[in-house]
């Protein structure tokens, strides 16, 4: 929980889908996976497809929200990074099995699925300890 109401999400928000024109205007392309989803979907995918440190990822979450995240918000979005990473890792395994090379993303998604799941679970455990 903690993500708020569903909203329109791109669901494939990673660097190649962000274009910037000569005037500096940004465009988000490739909308075939778009739909109504938890707001964590897009930021989770964006971080999962980047090579950020944990601190950088937490900064991205704060920028996305427009404020310092509460403990509940942070664990929710960290959990979404883990889920998005796991989803894309499984997709990458399938692509590799079909002889389509995924590259370094496969390792990044594997690493992030484990790392961010652990971070989110630790935050849930901390809350239970103080409840």
Regions flagged by a language model, labelled:
Residues 75, 79-83:
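Start-of-helix signal in alpha-solenoid helical-repeat scaffolds, especially tetratricopeptide repeats
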Residues 40-69, 82-100, 119:
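Active-site activation/catalytic loop segments of kinase-like enzymes and analogous catalytic loops
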Residues 90-131:
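ATP/Mg2+ or Mg2+-diphosphate-binding catalytic cores
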Residues 69-75:
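Juxtamembrane loop-transmembrane helix junctions in multi-pass integral membrane proteins
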Residues 2-3, 32, 46-49, 78:
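Generic anion/oxyanion-binding catalytic loop in active/binding sites
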Residues 1-41:
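Active-site acidic catalytic loop and adjacent metal/ATP-binding pocket
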């Amino acid at each position: 929980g903690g993500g708020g109401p569903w909203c329109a999400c791109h669901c494939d928000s990673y660097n190649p889908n962000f274009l910037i024109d000569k005037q500096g205007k940004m465009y988000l392309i490739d909308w075939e996976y778009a739909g109504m989803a938890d707001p964590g979907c897009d930021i989770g995918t964006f971080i999962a497809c980047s090579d950020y440190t944990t601190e950088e990822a937490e900064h991205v979450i704060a920028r996305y929200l427009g404020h310092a995240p509460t403990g509940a918000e942070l664990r929710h979005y960290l959990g979404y990074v883990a889920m998005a990473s796991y989803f894309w890792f499984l997709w990458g395994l399938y692509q590799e099995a079909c002889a389509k090379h995924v590259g370094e993303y496969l390792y990044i998604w594997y690493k992030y699925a484990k790392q961010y799941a652990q971070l989110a679970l630790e935050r849930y455990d901390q809350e239970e300890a103080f409840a």
